[in-house]
Each structure stands twice: as structure tokens, then as C-alpha cells.
């Protein structure tokens, strides 16, 4: 590994829970439904994050635990069975139903796995019922996707076909572009997980080579490996360098000649670097502090430091899987400080002491920091934006240059003084 300093910290946290991942998962698999077993607070969180109109028919909902459930005056399992049956009667197009645990359901020990098992027996294949936890007690933000994918893996059929499996949710247009590149390289059998329909799961076996698109899929990667798949070690496809190394790792795994890879990637790299130039001009030399939330922090820091010239003050991450992150950490500048976990008060003190030009953080911390004159970027935007791949490098950089340009416009006197 590089000379990066790895530290651990524990204490009060300021992060979204794993329920938030429903917002992009329900868009990815339109034949699935995500039923949160939780409180009105859970319902408000998902509804607000998704921005769904009141008249829409969303593919998620909340079975709200009332006081009777919390006090044990009603059998929560029976109540949940009733809610599920009413839902399926109203929405017969649902093919896969995810029961999603929350803080309240975890606290009162509702056994969602037992509920799912009983419903699968009763429904006799009409709908597949799965469960995972999105509880803030057990998960943060993006880990909800990890739980959902892990729940799907036992349903994946076996196969001896040689294939490349892209694992992690991507924007459809980005995925199509990446698959097209792999096809041009000569890798014809490319599938994605999660699929665009929950019932069209890719097959898996010893000839399956897994290329992770997201860094937060620890449990998913472990389960796929247990199924016999090979995990390709590579940085993640953020920025020109990361995306290039990611594609090259897949090509090497399939024995594709380097000259073929270069002939296809070099024009994309040249175009992407030119598109990056105006953003690099704005970002170069600026100090960046990343607070933990999405587990994208390390790949983002690598991109912003190596390709955009930013000075990294600290990289916070909720969890650090050293195996999945080894290729990323090796590319970081040697003086980087990585902090796993969070004590939010201590981290905020370090933010103030270091006077960064930009802080990447959760929505709950952004406004207070902005009020102190510190420019911020919501980490949630990285998950909702199409930022993966060589072609998207300039769009990714713009997410960080934009708040700095906004700050300059709002503070023209300070900008002139600093210049």
C-alpha cells in the first residue's frame, strides 16, 4: 500500500441510513417493490429523498409501525402479512418484494426473514419476497444496496459460461456505454447486477469474472466469491485514470492484447482530458476535506488529487475494506490521512482548523458549514449523478468546481483579495 496514514475513530455520527439506497434501486428494477417496515420518520425520509409527487405510484412504501406494534399489543408479524397481501392485491405487477428493516423494526425484533419465508410459501412463486436491513443501527447510506444485492444472490442461476459481470448500480446510459467498450474489446458476454428487471438475474459460476462498479459492496463481493466467481482487483471507474485501469484490469483478465485496449481507449482518454482542463484550472491547489458517508470518498480523493490537483486534507470513510480498496489506496499521495469511522464533533473541529476550500459532506452538515463560510458539496449527489467512466470525468469534476465558482460569485471581494 502507499504511505497513506490509516486511522480509526468512533463516536457520534452524522450520516444517512441504508434506507436511502431504495431511491436508486427502485428506479433500477421497476418490477420490484421496496416495503420499509418502519416509522413515519422512515417514510418521510424516503419520500423526501426520492422527490416523488403525491399523485405518483412509487415502487416503494412504508408499513408504519404504530404504538400498538411497538408496545407489543399487536402481533407485528400478522399485521405485516396483512399489509403485504393488500399491497400485492393492489399492485399485481410486482415481481419481487423487498421487506426492508429499519431502526424501529430492528429494536422490537421483527423477524423479517421469517415473514419473507412464510410469504414465499403462501404465494407459491407468484411473487418473490426477500428481506434485508436498511437500519441506521446496522448500515449507513450506500450499504442498503449491498444488503439488497446480497439478498438476490441465492436466486442467481448457476452457469459455466465465461462472462464479465458488472456489479453495482449504474445509470443506464453509463452502463450501455461501458458495455459497448467491453464489446469492442472483444468481451461479448457482459451482464450487470442488479439487472434492469429483478426477475432477469444473471447466472454465475467459476467462469464468471466480477468487476465492481461501486466500492461499498463488501458483502455482495464476498457472497459472489463464495459462489465461485472471481473478483477482478482494480481501482473504481471514477475519473480518467481510475476508469482506464478498471477497463484494463478486465481486459487483462480476458487475455486481450494491450495494443487493442490502447487503440480503443486512447481517443476516449484524450477527449476526456481536454474536457477536464477548465475544471482542473479551478480545482488545482484547492484544499479538500471529505467527511464520511458514501464510501466513495477514497476513489473521489484519488481522482481529485491526481487528476485535478487538489490538496487532500483528510479522507473520512464510514468503513474501510482494505482488500477492495487496496488498488485505490496505492494510488493516493503518500501524505494522505484516511480516517475510518466518525466522531463528528472532532472531525468538524479538524475541518475548522484546516480551513479547507471545499468540504464533501452529508446534507445535515452542509448548511451549518456554509453558514460558517465553508463551501460544501453534498456527498449524496455522487450517488445520484452519472459519474462513472472515462467520458464522465469532466462531469464528475464539475460537481466539485461548481460550488467553488458559486462561492467566488457570492464573495467577489474575498476572491479579489485572495488573488
From Swiss-Prot:
Its EC number is 1.3.7.7. It holds the Pfam family Oxidored_nitro. Its cofactor is [4Fe-4S] cluster. Keywords: 4Fe-4S, ATP-binding, Chlorophyll biosynthesis, Iron, Iron-sulfur, Metal-binding, Nucleotide-binding, Oxidoreductase, Photosynthesis. [4Fe-4S] cluster binds at residues 17, 42, 103. It catalyses: chlorophyllide a + oxidized 2[4Fe-4S]-[ferredoxin] + 2 ADP + 2 phosphate = protochlorophyllide a + reduced 2[4Fe-4S]-[ferredoxin] + 2 ATP + 2 H2O. Binds 1 [4Fe-4S] cluster per heterodimer. The cluster is bound at the heterodimer interface by residues from both subunits. It is an enzyme of class 1 (oxidoreductase). Pathway: Porphyrin-containing compound metabolism; chlorophyll biosynthesis (light-independent). The keyword Nucleotide-binding applies. The keyword Transport does not apply. PANTHER family: LIGHT-INDEPENDENT PROTOCHLOROPHYLLIDE REDUCTASE SUBUNIT N. Belongs to the BchN/ChlN family. NCBIfam families: DPOR_bchN (TIGR01279), PRK02842.1 (NF002768). HAMAP family: ChlN_BchN. Component of the dark-operative protochlorophyllide reductase (DPOR) that uses Mg-ATP and reduced ferredoxin to reduce ring D of protochlorophyllide (Pchlide) to form chlorophyllide a (Chlide). This reaction is light-independent. The NB-protein (ChlN-ChlB) is the catalytic component of the complex. Protochlorophyllide reductase is composed of three subunits; ChlL, ChlN and ChlB. Forms a heterotetramer of two ChlB and two ChlN subunits. This is Light-independent protochlorophyllide reductase subunit N. The gene is chlN.
Amino acid at each position: 500500500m502507499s504511505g497513506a496514514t490509516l486511522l480509526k475513530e468512533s463516536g457520534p455520527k452524522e450520516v444517512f441510513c441504508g434506507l436511502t439506497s431504495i431511491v436508486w434501486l427502485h428506479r433500477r428494477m421497476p418490477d420490484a417493490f421496496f416495503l420499509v417496515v418502519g416509522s413515519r420518520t422512515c417514510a418521510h425520509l424516503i419520500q423526501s429523498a426520492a422527490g416523488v409527487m403525491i399523485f405518483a405510484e412509487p415502487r416503494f412504501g412504508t408499513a408504519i409501525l404504530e404504538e400498538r406494534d411497538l408496545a407489543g399489543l399487536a402481533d407485528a408479524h400478522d399485521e405485516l402479512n396483512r399489509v403485504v397481501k393488500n399491497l400485492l392485491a393492489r399492485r399485481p405487477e410486482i415481481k419481487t418484494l423487498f421487506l426492508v428493516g429499519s431502526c424501529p423494526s430492528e429494536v422490537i425484533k421483527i423477524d423479517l426473514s421469517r415473514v419473507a419465508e412464510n410469504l414465499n410459501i403462501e404465494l407459491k412463486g407468484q411473487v418473490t419476497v426477500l428481506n434485508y436491513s436498511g437500519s441506521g443501527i446496522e448500515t449507513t447510506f450506500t450499504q442498503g444496496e449491498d444488503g439488497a444485492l446480497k439478498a438476490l444472490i441465492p436466486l442467481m442461476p448457476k452457469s459455466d459460461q465465461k462472462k464479465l459481470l458488472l456489479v453495482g448500480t449504474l445509470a443506464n446510459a453509463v452502463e450501455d456505454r461501458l458495455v459497448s467498450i467491453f464489446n469492442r474489446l472483444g468481451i461479448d458476454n457482459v451482464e450487470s447486477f442488479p439487472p434492469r428487471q429483478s426477475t432477469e438475474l444473471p447466472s454465475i459460476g467459476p467462469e464468471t469474472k466480477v468487476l465492481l462498479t461501486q466500492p461499498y459492496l463488501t458483502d455482495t463481493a464476498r457472497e459472489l466469491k463464495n459462489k465461485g466467481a472471481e473478483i477482478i482487483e482494480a481501482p473504481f471507474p471514477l475519473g480518467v485514470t481510475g476508469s482506464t485501469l478498471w477497463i484494463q484490469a478486465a481486459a487483462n483478465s480476458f487475455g486481450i492484447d494491450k495494443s487493442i485496449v490502447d487503440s480503443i481507449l486512447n481517443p476516449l482518454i484524450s477527449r476526456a482530458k481536454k474536457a477536464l482542463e477548465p475544471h482542473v484550472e479551478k480545482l488545482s491547489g484547492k484544499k479538500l476535506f471529505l467527511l464520511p458517508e458514501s464510501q466513495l470518498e477514497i476513489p473521489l480523493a484519488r481522482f481529485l488529487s491526481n487528476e485535478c490537483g487538489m490538496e487532500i486534507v483528510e479522507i473520512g470513510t464510514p468503513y474501510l475494506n482494505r482488500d477492495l480498496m487496496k488498488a485505490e489506496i496505492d494510488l493516493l499521495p503518500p501524505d494522505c490521512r484516511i480516517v475510518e469511522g466518525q466522531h463528528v464533533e472532532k472531525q468538524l473541529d479538524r475541518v475548522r482548523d484546516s480551513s479547507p476550500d471545499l468540504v464533501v459532506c452529508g446534507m445535515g452538515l452542509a448548511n451549518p458549514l456554509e453558514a460558517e463560510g465553508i463551501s460544501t458539496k453534498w456527498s449524496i449527489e455522487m450517488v445520484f449523478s452519472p459519474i462513472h467512466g472515462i467520458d464522465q470525468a469532466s462531469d464528475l469534476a464539475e460537481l466539485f468546481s461548481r460550488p467553488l465558482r458559486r462561492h467566488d460569485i457570492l464573495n467577489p471581494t474575498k476572491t479579489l483579495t485572495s488573488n
